[in-house]
A protein has these predicted regions:
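Start-of-domain marker
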Residues: 23-118
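Acidic/His-rich structured neighborhood in mature extracellular/periplasmic domains
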Residues: 134, 146-215
């Protein structure tokens, strides 16, 4: 892939830390508590209200990208070390600051399933407050990615547990692999090169488009190429409610592209806003574009949300996580 906008590499070490394989011990653990996207931060009150707490909020509660209204990346709450009782130990995501002048080593420890399952526990060890602030800032991306991956893994595990297997078969027939679609998702449209699958509720709509086109261009993964193909497919296949209306990509805020390698698959991730031409509907989208097997086609999985009455962070995180569940079909034995 050319013209790298940015590159994100989730290391094998981090993925191993965040894996959710249930072993004998995990089977005995209680289920996690808390709402999706929540993090409990175990730190004393003075540090929470000072520079260290500000750093935590900047890193974990900054604005979630490409949402029309401001929403925090995660919802964070403070618990003091003395108040960190059993009730809080079973929370889904926990960030613990262990500040001890007599400690043996500074750094960050990533663990899962310490007190519950599936749980993400991150511990920052430091000799003093300044050291804790430095370590937090130095490991900002990795800490945020660890929590994001833990949230993503829970969604994917649920999708696999309650999977609509027939949808995966349909997608695999067209592109050679498929995400895992949980119960509630239905097939809306299918052509030779375009599939529309959605979970439609009364006031929300979470959809995924899967489409492909020949990899004939020198710059298949530039923003211009990705958006041009996206708009062409949407105009042809996704009409609006009224005549002369269709879904397209909003240019009010320019989409961004970054290249990601995740569990062996390299893809261009595009974030932006969709809208309906000649109408007033819109919302966020995120897409993954990558070469098909043999590199003859470009495959695009495009996840989007319509939820005008509600915050959209969790709706988008849910449908985006399904893109990360994509797997190539295993060869027939």
């Amino acid at each position: 892939m050319k013209k790298l906008v940015s590159f994100v590499l989730l290391t094998a070490t981090l993925l191993g830390v965040l894996s959710c394989n249930r072993g004998p011990r995990k089977a005995l653990l209680p289920n996690v508590s808390g709402k999706a996207g929540e993090i409990i931060v175990v730190i004393d009150r003075d540090n929470w209200e000072g520079n260290l707490g500000n750093a935590v909020r900047d890193i974990l509660a900054g604005d979630c990208p490409y949402l029309a209204q401001k929403e925090a990346l995660f919802t964070i709450a403070n618990v003091t070390p003395t108040g960190f009782a059993d009730l809080f130990k079973v929370h889904r995501n926990i960030l613990i600051f262990n500040i001890d002048p007599q400690g043996q080593e500074e750094g960050v420890i990533y663990r899962n399933d310490v007190w519950a399952h599936p749980q993400c526990v991150i511990q920052v060890n430091a000799f003093d407050n300044d050291g804790a602030l430095r370590i937090m800032n130095e490991n900002a991306d990795r800490i945020a990615n660890a929590v994001e991956q833990a949230e993503r893994d829970r969604i994917i595990a649920n999708a696999k547990l309650y999977e609509e297997v027939n949808l995966a078969k349909i997608v695999t027939e067209m592109v050679g692999g498929s995400p895992h679609f949980p119960s509630g998702y239905k097939l809306k449209k299918r052509t030779d090169n375009f599939i529309w699958i959605a979970d439609e509720k009364q006031y929300t709509n979470q959809g995924i488009f899967i489409y492909k086109y020949p990899a004939a261009e020198a710059e298949n993964f530039t923003q211009e190429s990705i958006i041009a193909h996206r708009n062409a497919f949407l105009k042809e296949n996704v009409p609006g409610m009224f005549d002369n209306t269709w879904m397209t990509t909003s240019d009010f805020v320019a989409p961004t592209v970054e290249f990601i390698r995740f569990r062996g698959l390299q893809f261009a991730q595009t974030r932006g806003f969709w809208e309906v031409h000649n109408d007033f509907m819109g919302g966020p989208f995120v897409s993954h574009s990558f070469y098909g097997q043999g590199a003859n086609d470009v495959i695009v999985m495009d996840a989007w949300v319509y939820a005008p009455r509600y915050d959209k962070r969790q709706y988008l995180r849910q449908v985006e996580s399904l893109l990360y569940s994509f797997e190539w079909a295993k060869p027939a034995e």
